[in-house]
Swiss-Prot record:
SUPFAM superfamilies: Adenine nucleotide alpha hydrolases-like (SSF52402), Argininosuccinate synthetase, C-terminal domain (SSF69864)
Signal peptide: none
Encoding gene (name): argG
Keywords: Amino-acid biosynthesis, Arginine biosynthesis, ATP-binding, Cytoplasm, Ligase, Nucleotide-binding
Lineage: Bacteria, Pseudomonadati, Pseudomonadota, Alphaproteobacteria, Candidatus Pelagibacterales
Location of the protein in the cell: Cytoplasm
UniProt protein name: Argininosuccinate synthase
Assembly and binders: Homotetramer.
Length: 395
Protein backbone atom coordinates (compact mmCIF):
# COMPACT_ATOMS: atom_id res chain seq x y z
CA UNK A 1 0.00 0.00 0.00
CA UNK A 2 1.35 3.40 -1.02
CA UNK A 3 1.93 5.73 1.95
CA UNK A 4 0.22 9.10 2.07
CA UNK A 5 2.04 12.31 1.29
CA UNK A 6 2.84 14.44 4.34
CA UNK A 7 2.29 18.09 5.26
CA UNK A 8 3.95 19.79 8.24
CA UNK A 9 1.68 22.44 9.78
CA UNK A 10 2.90 25.21 12.08
CA UNK A 11 0.43 24.42 14.85
CA UNK A 12 -0.39 26.43 17.97
CA UNK A 13 -3.32 24.35 19.19
CA UNK A 14 -5.61 27.37 18.92
CA UNK A 15 -8.72 27.94 16.84
CA UNK A 16 -7.15 29.07 13.57
CA UNK A 17 -4.55 26.33 13.24
CA UNK A 18 -7.01 23.67 14.42
CA UNK A 19 -9.38 24.74 11.66
CA UNK A 20 -6.50 24.70 9.18
CA UNK A 21 -5.56 21.21 10.34
CA UNK A 22 -9.07 19.94 9.64
CA UNK A 23 -9.23 21.81 6.33
CA UNK A 24 -5.93 20.29 5.16
CA UNK A 25 -7.21 16.83 6.02
CA UNK A 26 -10.38 17.44 4.01
CA UNK A 27 -8.76 19.01 0.97
CA UNK A 28 -5.44 17.19 0.61
CA UNK A 29 -4.88 13.46 0.46
CA UNK A 30 -2.04 13.73 2.96
CA UNK A 31 -1.06 13.05 6.55
CA UNK A 32 -0.77 16.28 8.55
CA UNK A 33 2.11 16.50 11.03
CA UNK A 34 1.77 19.21 13.68
CA UNK A 35 4.86 21.27 14.52
CA UNK A 36 4.92 23.62 17.52
CA UNK A 37 7.92 25.83 18.30
CA UNK A 38 8.22 26.77 21.96
CA UNK A 39 9.77 30.23 21.77
CA UNK A 40 8.59 31.22 25.23
CA UNK A 41 4.90 31.77 24.58
CA UNK A 42 2.34 30.57 27.10
CA UNK A 43 2.18 26.98 25.95
CA UNK A 44 -0.09 24.19 27.14
CA UNK A 45 1.54 21.03 25.82
CA UNK A 46 -1.27 18.77 26.96
CA UNK A 47 -3.85 20.96 25.23
CA UNK A 48 -1.86 21.05 21.99
CA UNK A 49 -1.49 17.27 21.95
CA UNK A 50 -5.13 16.74 22.92
CA UNK A 51 -6.48 19.08 20.22
CA UNK A 52 -4.25 17.56 17.54
CA UNK A 53 -5.07 13.97 18.49
CA UNK A 54 -8.79 14.81 18.53
CA UNK A 55 -8.41 15.53 14.82
CA UNK A 56 -6.52 12.30 14.17
CA UNK A 57 -2.94 13.54 14.12
CA UNK A 58 -0.34 10.84 14.79
CA UNK A 59 2.87 12.89 14.77
CA UNK A 60 3.07 15.97 16.99
CA UNK A 61 6.37 17.81 17.48
CA UNK A 62 6.83 20.36 20.29
CA UNK A 63 10.36 21.75 20.21
CA UNK A 64 11.91 23.86 22.98
CA UNK A 65 13.68 26.72 21.19
CA UNK A 66 13.73 29.37 23.92
CA UNK A 67 17.51 29.64 24.36
CA UNK A 68 18.14 29.37 20.62
CA UNK A 69 15.54 32.05 19.95
CA UNK A 70 17.08 34.50 22.40
CA UNK A 71 20.76 33.77 21.71
CA UNK A 72 20.70 33.53 17.90
CA UNK A 73 17.82 35.84 17.01
CA UNK A 74 16.97 38.32 19.78
CA UNK A 75 20.53 39.10 20.90
CA UNK A 76 21.85 39.85 17.38
CA UNK A 77 18.87 42.18 16.94
CA UNK A 78 19.64 43.91 20.26
CA UNK A 79 23.23 44.41 19.11
CA UNK A 80 21.82 46.16 16.05
CA UNK A 81 19.40 48.29 18.15
CA UNK A 82 16.66 47.24 15.73
CA UNK A 83 13.55 49.40 16.09
CA UNK A 84 10.94 49.67 13.33
CA UNK A 85 9.29 53.05 12.76
CA UNK A 86 10.75 54.49 15.93
CA UNK A 87 8.99 52.30 18.50
CA UNK A 88 8.44 48.67 17.47
CA UNK A 89 11.07 46.25 18.84
CA UNK A 90 10.15 43.57 16.27
CA UNK A 91 8.98 40.91 18.70
CA UNK A 92 6.73 39.03 16.29
CA UNK A 93 8.99 39.58 13.28
CA UNK A 94 12.05 37.97 14.84
CA UNK A 95 10.33 34.72 15.88
CA UNK A 96 9.13 33.73 12.41
CA UNK A 97 12.52 33.00 10.80
CA UNK A 98 13.42 30.46 13.50
CA UNK A 99 10.02 28.75 13.35
CA UNK A 100 10.25 28.52 9.56
CA UNK A 101 13.76 27.04 9.77
CA UNK A 102 12.77 24.34 12.24
CA UNK A 103 9.51 23.59 10.43
CA UNK A 104 11.45 22.88 7.24
CA UNK A 105 13.83 20.69 9.26
CA UNK A 106 10.79 18.71 10.47
CA UNK A 107 9.50 18.44 6.90
CA UNK A 108 12.81 16.99 5.76
CA UNK A 109 12.93 14.59 8.71
CA UNK A 110 9.48 13.17 7.92
CA UNK A 111 9.85 13.36 4.16
CA UNK A 112 6.97 15.83 3.83
CA UNK A 113 6.26 17.35 0.45
CA UNK A 114 4.67 20.52 1.88
CA UNK A 115 4.50 22.91 4.83
CA UNK A 116 1.59 25.08 5.93
CA UNK A 117 1.05 28.07 8.22
CA UNK A 118 -1.89 29.94 9.72
CA UNK A 119 -0.95 33.50 8.77
CA UNK A 120 -3.77 35.59 7.35
CA UNK A 121 -3.77 37.00 3.84
CA UNK A 122 -3.54 40.57 5.14
CA UNK A 123 -0.59 40.13 7.48
CA UNK A 124 3.19 40.27 7.37
CA UNK A 125 3.74 36.82 8.84
CA UNK A 126 2.83 35.02 5.62
CA UNK A 127 5.81 36.76 4.00
CA UNK A 128 8.15 36.06 6.90
CA UNK A 129 7.27 32.37 7.05
CA UNK A 130 7.45 31.82 3.33
CA UNK A 131 10.77 33.59 2.82
CA UNK A 132 12.17 31.37 5.58
CA UNK A 133 10.66 28.27 3.99
CA UNK A 134 12.18 29.17 0.65
CA UNK A 135 15.64 29.76 2.13
CA UNK A 136 15.84 26.35 3.81
CA UNK A 137 13.55 24.32 1.55
CA UNK A 138 13.15 25.91 -1.88
CA UNK A 139 11.59 22.75 -3.30
CA UNK A 140 9.09 22.24 -0.47
CA UNK A 141 5.52 23.16 -1.44
CA UNK A 142 3.87 25.93 0.61
CA UNK A 143 0.16 25.75 1.45
CA UNK A 144 -1.30 29.04 2.71
CA UNK A 145 -4.98 28.30 3.52
CA UNK A 146 -5.96 31.92 4.15
CA UNK A 147 -5.11 32.68 0.51
CA UNK A 148 -6.95 29.62 -0.81
CA UNK A 149 -10.04 28.75 1.15
CA UNK A 150 -13.47 30.39 1.15
CA UNK A 151 -13.51 31.01 4.91
CA UNK A 152 -13.06 34.74 4.52
CA UNK A 153 -14.19 36.03 7.90
CA UNK A 154 -14.07 35.25 11.59
CA UNK A 155 -17.77 34.35 11.37
CA UNK A 156 -17.02 31.77 8.67
CA UNK A 157 -14.30 30.26 10.86
CA UNK A 158 -16.63 29.95 13.84
CA UNK A 159 -19.27 28.21 11.70
CA UNK A 160 -16.65 25.79 10.34
CA UNK A 161 -15.36 25.08 13.85
CA UNK A 162 -18.85 24.35 15.18
CA UNK A 163 -19.58 22.07 12.23
CA UNK A 164 -16.43 20.04 12.95
CA UNK A 165 -16.63 20.07 16.76
CA UNK A 166 -13.50 22.18 17.12
CA UNK A 167 -13.39 24.00 20.50
CA UNK A 168 -13.95 27.74 20.18
CA UNK A 169 -12.03 29.83 22.74
CA UNK A 170 -13.76 32.83 24.31
CA UNK A 171 -12.79 35.61 26.66
CA UNK A 172 -14.27 36.10 30.14
CA UNK A 173 -17.35 37.71 28.59
CA UNK A 174 -17.93 34.79 26.25
CA UNK A 175 -16.83 36.74 23.17
CA UNK A 176 -14.12 35.68 20.67
CA UNK A 177 -10.70 36.64 22.02
CA UNK A 178 -8.32 39.25 20.65
CA UNK A 179 -5.62 38.17 18.21
CA UNK A 180 -2.61 37.55 20.44
CA UNK A 181 0.94 36.54 19.57
CA UNK A 182 3.53 36.02 22.26
CA UNK A 183 7.03 34.73 22.76
CA UNK A 184 9.78 35.24 25.32
CA UNK A 185 10.59 38.65 23.83
CA UNK A 186 7.13 40.20 23.57
CA UNK A 187 3.34 39.97 23.45
CA UNK A 188 1.22 41.62 20.76
CA UNK A 189 -2.54 42.15 20.90
CA UNK A 190 -4.62 43.13 17.87
CA UNK A 191 -8.21 43.20 16.62
CA UNK A 192 -11.67 44.05 17.97
CA UNK A 193 -11.81 47.50 19.64
CA UNK A 194 -8.18 48.17 18.68
CA UNK A 195 -9.09 48.23 14.99
CA UNK A 196 -10.61 51.69 15.51
CA UNK A 197 -7.67 54.00 16.29
CA UNK A 198 -9.88 56.41 18.25
CA UNK A 199 -10.45 53.72 20.91
CA UNK A 200 -8.08 53.55 23.84
CA UNK A 201 -6.63 50.14 24.61
CA UNK A 202 -8.47 48.64 27.61
CA UNK A 203 -6.23 47.99 30.58
CA UNK A 204 -7.24 44.31 30.75
CA UNK A 205 -5.43 43.68 27.44
CA UNK A 206 -2.00 44.04 29.01
CA UNK A 207 -0.59 40.71 30.13
CA UNK A 208 3.07 41.34 30.91
CA UNK A 209 3.14 44.87 32.24
CA UNK A 210 1.31 46.71 34.98
CA UNK A 211 0.07 50.22 34.35
CA UNK A 212 2.82 52.70 35.31
CA UNK A 213 0.30 54.35 37.65
CA UNK A 214 -0.10 51.06 39.51
CA UNK A 215 3.59 50.17 39.55
CA UNK A 216 5.38 50.13 42.93
CA UNK A 217 6.06 53.47 44.61
CA UNK A 218 9.61 52.29 45.28
CA UNK A 219 12.15 52.05 42.46
CA UNK A 220 13.80 48.79 41.42
CA UNK A 221 17.46 48.57 40.45
CA UNK A 222 19.00 46.05 38.07
CA UNK A 223 22.55 45.60 36.79
CA UNK A 224 23.09 43.92 33.42
CA UNK A 225 26.51 42.55 32.52
CA UNK A 226 27.71 42.29 28.91
CA UNK A 227 30.38 40.24 27.17
CA UNK A 228 31.19 40.61 23.47
CA UNK A 229 28.02 42.65 22.97
CA UNK A 230 25.59 40.20 24.56
CA UNK A 231 24.01 40.28 28.04
CA UNK A 232 25.25 37.43 30.23
CA UNK A 233 24.47 38.42 33.83
CA UNK A 234 21.71 40.06 35.86
CA UNK A 235 22.78 41.49 39.22
CA UNK A 236 26.03 39.57 38.94
CA UNK A 237 24.42 36.18 38.32
CA UNK A 238 25.18 34.40 35.06
CA UNK A 239 22.04 33.12 33.33
CA UNK A 240 21.15 31.24 30.17
CA UNK A 241 19.81 33.51 27.39
CA UNK A 242 16.23 32.40 27.95
CA UNK A 243 16.36 32.72 31.73
CA UNK A 244 18.07 36.10 31.50
CA UNK A 245 15.34 37.55 29.29
CA UNK A 246 12.64 36.01 31.47
CA UNK A 247 14.13 37.62 34.58
CA UNK A 248 14.30 41.01 32.89
CA UNK A 249 10.71 40.61 31.68
CA UNK A 250 9.56 40.10 35.25
CA UNK A 251 11.38 43.05 36.81
CA UNK A 252 10.54 45.44 33.96
CA UNK A 253 6.93 44.31 33.67
CA UNK A 254 6.13 44.89 37.33
CA UNK A 255 7.53 48.43 36.96
CA UNK A 256 5.31 49.28 34.00
CA UNK A 257 8.07 49.25 31.38
CA UNK A 258 7.78 48.17 27.76
CA UNK A 259 4.31 49.18 26.54
CA UNK A 260 3.72 50.46 23.01
CA UNK A 261 0.45 51.34 21.26
CA UNK A 262 1.41 51.41 17.59
CA UNK A 263 -0.09 52.01 14.17
CA UNK A 264 2.45 50.43 11.83
CA UNK A 265 2.96 50.27 8.09
CA UNK A 266 2.80 46.64 7.08
CA UNK A 267 5.08 45.31 4.35
CA UNK A 268 2.09 44.38 2.20
CA UNK A 269 0.90 47.99 2.09
CA UNK A 270 -1.78 48.50 4.76
CA UNK A 271 -1.70 50.08 8.20
CA UNK A 272 -2.53 48.10 11.33
CA UNK A 273 -2.85 48.95 15.00
CA UNK A 274 -1.59 46.82 17.84
CA UNK A 275 -0.61 46.93 21.48
CA UNK A 276 2.85 45.53 22.14
CA UNK A 277 4.58 44.65 25.39
CA UNK A 278 8.35 44.12 25.37
CA UNK A 279 9.50 44.70 28.96
CA UNK A 280 12.83 42.85 29.04
CA UNK A 281 13.70 43.90 25.51
CA UNK A 282 13.15 47.56 26.38
CA UNK A 283 15.60 47.20 29.28
CA UNK A 284 18.16 45.48 27.08
CA UNK A 285 17.97 48.17 24.41
CA UNK A 286 18.62 50.90 26.99
CA UNK A 287 21.41 48.99 28.68
CA UNK A 288 23.12 48.00 25.42
CA UNK A 289 23.18 51.59 24.17
CA UNK A 290 24.59 52.67 27.52
CA UNK A 291 27.44 50.14 27.49
CA UNK A 292 28.28 50.97 23.87
CA UNK A 293 28.49 54.67 24.76
CA UNK A 294 31.67 54.05 26.77
CA UNK A 295 33.16 51.15 24.78
CA UNK A 296 32.79 52.12 21.11
CA UNK A 297 34.25 55.01 19.12
CA UNK A 298 32.04 57.71 17.63
CA UNK A 299 32.37 56.54 14.02
CA UNK A 300 31.27 52.99 14.84
CA UNK A 301 28.30 54.18 16.88
CA UNK A 302 27.18 56.60 14.19
CA UNK A 303 27.52 53.99 11.45
CA UNK A 304 25.31 51.63 13.47
CA UNK A 305 22.72 54.38 13.89
CA UNK A 306 22.88 55.08 10.17
CA UNK A 307 22.19 51.51 9.06
CA UNK A 308 19.69 50.67 11.82
CA UNK A 309 16.48 51.73 9.98
CA UNK A 310 17.34 49.53 6.99
CA UNK A 311 18.44 46.69 9.27
CA UNK A 312 15.14 46.88 11.18
CA UNK A 313 13.12 47.08 7.97
CA UNK A 314 14.77 43.93 6.61
CA UNK A 315 13.81 42.04 9.77
CA UNK A 316 10.27 43.43 9.74
CA UNK A 317 9.80 42.44 6.10
CA UNK A 318 11.01 38.88 6.65
CA UNK A 319 14.51 39.18 5.18
CA UNK A 320 16.37 37.74 8.17
CA UNK A 321 18.12 35.22 5.93
CA UNK A 322 18.92 37.69 3.16
CA UNK A 323 22.41 38.65 2.00
CA UNK A 324 21.59 42.25 2.86
CA UNK A 325 20.80 41.41 6.50
CA UNK A 326 23.88 39.20 6.79
CA UNK A 327 26.07 42.05 5.51
CA UNK A 328 24.54 44.60 7.86
CA UNK A 329 24.96 42.16 10.76
CA UNK A 330 28.69 42.00 10.02
CA UNK A 331 28.86 45.79 10.32
CA UNK A 332 26.81 45.69 13.54
CA UNK A 333 29.13 43.05 15.02
CA UNK A 334 32.42 44.47 13.76
CA UNK A 335 33.53 45.67 17.19
CA UNK A 336 31.24 43.69 19.47
CA UNK A 337 34.31 42.20 21.18
CA UNK A 338 34.88 45.63 22.75
CA UNK A 339 31.38 45.80 24.22
CA UNK A 340 32.09 44.43 27.70
CA UNK A 341 31.10 45.68 31.13
CA UNK A 342 27.97 46.40 33.13
CA UNK A 343 25.16 48.93 33.31
CA UNK A 344 23.05 49.73 36.36
CA UNK A 345 19.48 50.85 35.67
CA UNK A 346 16.76 52.36 37.83
CA UNK A 347 13.19 51.32 37.02
CA UNK A 348 10.33 53.45 38.28
CA UNK A 349 6.73 53.71 37.06
CA UNK A 350 7.42 53.10 33.38
CA UNK A 351 10.72 54.98 33.28
CA UNK A 352 14.28 53.75 32.88
CA UNK A 353 17.21 55.77 34.21
CA UNK A 354 20.83 54.81 33.57
CA UNK A 355 22.58 55.04 36.94
CA UNK A 356 26.11 53.91 36.06
CA UNK A 357 28.33 52.25 33.44
CA UNK A 358 31.48 50.22 34.09
CA UNK A 359 33.95 48.69 31.65
CA UNK A 360 37.59 47.76 31.14
CA UNK A 361 37.33 48.28 27.35
CA UNK A 362 37.10 52.02 27.80
CA UNK A 363 36.69 54.49 24.94
CA UNK A 364 35.87 57.16 27.54
CA UNK A 365 38.69 59.24 29.03
CA UNK A 366 38.05 60.96 32.34
CA UNK A 367 41.29 62.94 31.94
CA UNK A 368 40.34 64.36 28.55
CA UNK A 369 36.83 65.36 29.54
CA UNK A 370 37.72 66.74 32.97
CA UNK A 371 37.02 70.42 33.77
CA UNK A 372 40.24 70.41 35.77
CA UNK A 373 43.52 71.38 34.11
CA UNK A 374 45.22 68.54 32.24
CA UNK A 375 47.82 68.08 29.52
CA UNK A 376 46.18 65.23 27.64
CA UNK A 377 44.03 67.51 25.48
CA UNK A 378 45.60 70.35 23.46
CA UNK A 379 43.06 73.17 23.41
CA UNK A 380 45.06 75.17 20.88
CA UNK A 381 44.20 72.59 18.23
CA UNK A 382 40.52 73.41 18.58
CA UNK A 383 40.84 76.77 16.82
CA UNK A 384 42.39 75.11 13.76
CA UNK A 385 39.64 72.49 13.87
CA UNK A 386 36.92 75.18 13.87
CA UNK A 387 38.60 77.16 11.07
CA UNK A 388 38.74 74.04 8.92
CA UNK A 389 35.01 73.52 9.33
CA UNK A 390 34.30 77.19 8.59
CA UNK A 391 35.82 76.62 5.15
CA UNK A 392 33.40 73.77 4.54
CA UNK A 393 30.49 76.18 5.01
CA UNK A 394 31.78 78.33 2.12
CA UNK A 395 32.52 75.51 -0.31
Amino acid sequence: MKSKKKIVLAYSGGLDTSIILKWLQENYDAEVICYTADVGQEIDRKKIIKNAKRLGVKNIIIEDLKDTFVKDYVFPMIRGHAIYEGVYLLGTSIARPLIAKRQIAAAKKFGAYAVSHGSTGKGNDQVRFELGYHYFGPKVKIIAPWRIWKLNSRTDLIKYAKKNNIPIPTDKKGAPPFSIDDNLYHTSTEGKVLENPKNSAPEFLFQRTVSPEKAPNKASFVTIGFKNGDPITVNGKKLSPGNLLEKLNNVAGKNGIGRVDLVENRFIGIKSRGVYETPGGTLLMSAHRAIESITLDKETMHKKDEIMPKYAELIYNGYWYSKARFKLQKIVDLKKNKVNGSVKLKLYKGNITIMSRQTKSNAYSMKKVSFEENKTFNKSNVERFINFHKQKLRS
